[in-house]
């Protein structure tokens, strides 16, 4: 038994010394509002309603998740127990106050910006998530655990103008009071009231967003008003003033919102000789400067001109350098990796995109990662991914099973799905609840069923076997960066080796107790090896190795340091 323990300690201690690499990162993507409610006192703000009487109607209201709740889970070790390297939180910026028509013109539920995709004010935190002090404590805690922090960045569009925002900031005449505007008015149509009219001029204004009367090409992704949202004029180099409604908003708030205003953004609330994109980039980069944010997932990448992404990347790298220099006592100040950028590019796979790499992207989200959990063919998919990693320096796949727009994975086979993901080359992104069996809600019956994919994390209904599996493989992955960044030799349909110099791991899928695993050419006879998932050891004999048992259709084999040959 002592030998087994020593072997395991040697393997994990040696691996733990290796530096973090984004190419092997395990990213935990969490919708803050749906994860954990740590403070019920911040659940209702800005005149919003949170309860319309049924689960279907409440599908897209704010549900109470916040920084305090996430901090509590971080302190419990929830993320470190899964080997998480990066926590990706949905955007923390203040969201539109009112609701948008759910399912578009159908309007079968009120749709709020709980998910962070509908920004109103980039200079302060949404009160539903928590305060600046609470966010700082969360980021600092994650950094102290060796975990990077990602947020979202969107240069394409602000949030929708809504009835409630129009009433509160007076940019359009609605005929409603604030209380009435917060009701779910089924007969109200965004398409008729805002999208085709010029009230946008009172929202962000003609200099900032494309107006319906300007004749833009709706078939051109760089000009289209995506899902009817106002579209920033990212091609414009014309100087603009900060939108009048924002100036009015800040004047109305005075110092009342100081607990939520990003200190590094306060100086950016003045008119400059800037284009719309310059304001946006400065506002977004200020979160890096203030909190040491380590990366961004950029939204709808192909809808924004590449030069703007390049400018954002440069601004964020400068801001991160400034933060590290200003916080020498913070463990994250010693990190040397550059600011990380990935993004959603519609239907992207693992293909290398040199223009985006030159703009500062290290990956684009891989929409085509297999989500069925079929372990009979995944080795060949892994081979293609590993070959791509080897061919393109600092570019790697960003793989996922589920995300906020898709629940494509076989939820009845998440053990094998988790194996396919967590042993894949490149980034492995776990969507909150993938590891626990988080269930859908009645919102799946709405026309816009996406809201059902974003259900609340139910901490009283955890699939313990599934969670244990994600934890085991996640920790193995974190301790062995070669899994994500190494080259691959495929031996057969179920067996491959990841290697980087002398660092080597053999992966065997669907192993059988009665069938020895062939390791000839990888581990010499007499080498003591450990199967990391079950922590069993064995000695290689006649080019083969056997273990008394296997669990969950996987074996991860590595040589013990004291007998490597």
Residue ranges with predicted function:
Residues 14-148, 156-158, 163-166, 187, ...:
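N-terminal structural segment of carbohydrate-active enzymes
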Residues 23, 44-48, 95-116, 155-249, ...:
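Aromatic- and acidic-residue-enriched segments that line the glycan-binding/catalytic groove
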Residues 23-27, 80-87, 143-150, 291-296, ...:
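Loop/turn elements at helix/coil->beta-strand transitions in domains of secreted/extracellular proteins
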Residues 30, 79, 89, 122, ...:
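Conserved, mostly hydrophobic/aromatic
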Residues 34, 85-97, 152-162, 300-305, ...:
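Short, solvent-exposed turn/loop segments enriched in Gly/Ser/Thr/Pro and often Arg
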Residues 53-68, 116-131, 228-277, 294-303, ...:
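The substrate-binding groove and active-site-proximal loops of carbohydrate-active enzymes
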Residues 66-78, 272-290, 413-418:
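Short, acidic/polar
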Residues 186-192, 197, 282-400, 411-412, ...:
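Active-site-proximal helices and loops of the catalytic beta/alpha 8
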